[in-house]
UniProtKB/Swiss-Prot annotation:
The protein, known as: Cytochrome b
Keywords of the record: Electron transport, Heme, Iron, Membrane, Metal-binding, Mitochondrion, Mitochondrion inner membrane, Respiratory chain, Transmembrane, Transmembrane helix, Transport, Ubiquinone
Residue positions binding heme b b562: H83, H182
Coiled-coil blocks: none
Lineage, broadest ranks: Eukaryota, Metazoa, Chordata, Craniata, Vertebrata
Oligomer status and interactors: The cytochrome bc1 complex contains 11 subunits: 3 respiratory subunits (MT-CYB, CYC1 and UQCRFS1), 2 core proteins (UQCRC1 and UQCRC2) and 6 low-molecular weight proteins (UQCRH/QCR6, UQCRB/QCR7, UQCRQ/QCR8, UQCR10/QCR9, UQCR11/QCR10 and a cleavage product of UQCRFS1). This cytochrome bc1 complex then forms a dimer.
Length: 379
């Protein structure tokens, strides 16, 4: 068996990636979230596949087909709620994974980091088109509002929106193509994940100390496979509690009303994991400016390798930048809260302050604190 896994052309790749992979001996539980994301992706693809067997992407039957899945299909309700809440678990793991990357300076591995950001954007696109599929009120109006933002693009905006809609409004053509996108994108994500791992294994993993760990590495199996299995057990427990006891806690009650183009909901808002970006979008009065800010709120992550001037790797020994980092996390939580609030005073003002602070922390405060800490080291 040992000879086979080391010499067989296919098993050799798996062996070098998951069994004999030299791994730093000191990586903490914050490094578990990569494997948890892989687990989430597998859950989403499997549950999504079973849902697609019963779902119909037609405006007249989409809503009733989801109701049929929940009522008439064997364990259809469980598959549906695992898929819906699995998306939330996916994004929780994704946010922690990115947050850990920023805290421990993993962005210095720029190829891995940039592929990760492309993965983040692709996952957001997949979640957005997926949210439209049940064809409830919030699905329909969310699709209308978000796709309509593209009309802010000069010259080609209106044409682009109609091209995406497949007509002059969100209708049957839109739903059909969104279902097609939602089906294909997870497989594209899987391909990107393999590229992400390829780049990661080229350089080796980062570690909490930020020091070179080449002199102190251990094989991935059995040490980290056991550790990852424990993380997966916790994730599955949390997901089952969410899906079985609180299946609708993260959803919107408006989505239990069939889509009606003649009746606009009082507050149009996306799923909770998009609220921080939605708050940034809403805080800018200009439509094009809002769309650019929305894009930059994610793409700004690509600036981390360029803005990093610190002599030290990660924030573990850098108290000033550490404090700024936690202010950034608090700021993102405020933005998430604001995104779910109505567009009125004082929420608009808080949103504008939090949006400015978000960009200021990343573009100004963090590079300044890097320079200050570099000078302190010289003393």
């Amino acid at each position: 068996m040992k000879i086979l896994r080391k010499n067989h052309p296919l098993f050799k790749i798996i062996n070098h990636s998951f069994i004999d992979l030299p791994t730093p001996s000191n990586i903490s539980s914050w490094w578990n979230f990569g494997s948890l994301l892989g687990m989430c992706l597998m859950i989403q693809i499997l549950t999504g596949l079973f849902l697609a067997m019963h779902y119909t992407s037609d405006t007249t039957t989409a809503f009733s087909s989801v109701a049929h899945i929940c009522r008439d299909v064997n364990y259809g309700w469980l598959i549906r709620y695992l898929h819906a809440n699995g998306a939330s678990m996916f994004f929780i793991c994704l946010f922690i994974h990115v947050g850990r990357g920023i805290y421990y300076g993993s962005y210095v591995l720029s190829e891995t980091w940039n592929i990760g950001i492309i993965l983040f954007l692709t996952t957001m696109a997949t979640a957005f088109v997926g949210y439209v599929l049940p064809w409830g009120q919030m699905s329909f109006w969310g699709a209308t509002v978000i796709t309509n933002l593209l009309s802010a693009i000069p010259y080609i905006g209106s044409t682009l929106v109609e091209w995406i809609w497949g007509g002059f409004s969100v209708d049957k053509a839109t739903l059909t193509r969104f279902f097609a996108f939602h089906f294909i994108l997870p497989f594209i994500i899987t391909a990107f994940v393999l590229v992400h791992l390829l780049f990661l294994h080229e350089t080796g993993s980062n570690n909490p100390s930020g020091l070179n760990s080449n002199s102190d590495k251990i094989p991935f199996h059995p040490y980290y496979t056991i550790k990852d299995l424990l993380g997966i057990l916790f994730l599955l427990t949390a997901l089952m509690i969410l899906a079985l006891f609180f299946p609708d806690i993260l959803g919107d009650p408006d989505n239990y009303t069939p889509a009606n183009p003649l009746n606009t909901p009082a507050h149009i808002k996306p799923e909770w994991y998009f609220l921080f970006a939605y708050a940034i979008l809403r805080s800018i009065p200009n439509k094009l400016g809002g769309v650019l800010a929305l894009l930059l709120s994610i793409l700004i992550l690509m600036a981390f390798p360029l803005l990093n001037t610190s002599k030290q790797h990660g924030l573990i020994f850098r108290p000033i930048t550490q404090t700024i980092y936690w202010i950034l996390i608090a700021n993102l939580l405020v933005l998430t809260w604001i995104g779910g609030q109505p567009v009125e005073y004082p929420f608009t003002m808080i949103g504008q302050i939090a949006s400015i602070t978000y960009f200021a922390i990343i573009l100004i405060l963090m590079p300044v604190s890097n320079t200050i800490e570099n000078n302190i080291i010289k003393l």
